[in-house]
Amino acid sequence: MQVLVDADACPAVIKDMLFRAARRAEICVTLVANQFLRTPPSPFIKAVQVPAGFDVADARIVELAEPGDLVITADIPLAAAVLDKGAHALDPRGNWFSRENIEERLSTRAMMDQLRSAGIDTGGPAPFSARDGKTFASQLDRFLARHAPR
């Protein structure tokens, strides 16, 4: 089991939590981004830099994902793709993507894209909060308690 991170838009506080979890649980955490990422020295943490381009990092994450892995992403289509491969998907706010909710999330995303294309201001997500970080930490700990190798 490994943790793959869609790192381009992942909040720094979440990356720090993942770095601590990697060392504590001795699991591989791989950050994938189209820019250079500084990571702490650890045999459990690595960064993969991909070329710039639309969805290049997402494609690499899908390629690397295996059944049982955990993918951290806010990207709904990426979450759908890794769920199809049997991986788990968690967003940086601690919300799970699942077979039960992914179609609705994709539909909502498509509708919001259509509204934006029509010139309607749909706003954006709320700023990342301390509560979001706590929710993420709780969900990550629960997942690792069930799935990390012992």
Curated annotation (Swiss-Prot):
Query: Which domain of life does the protein's organism represent?
Result: Bacteria
Family matches, as InterPro entries: UPF0178 (IPR003791)
Q: Tell me which family the UniProt entry assigns to this protein.
A: Belongs to the UPF0178 family.
> In its UniProt entry, what is this protein called?
UPF0178 protein Bcen2424_1660
Protein source organism: Burkholderia cenocepacia (strain HI2424)
State the organism's lineage.
Bacteria, Pseudomonadati, Pseudomonadota, Betaproteobacteria, Burkholderiales
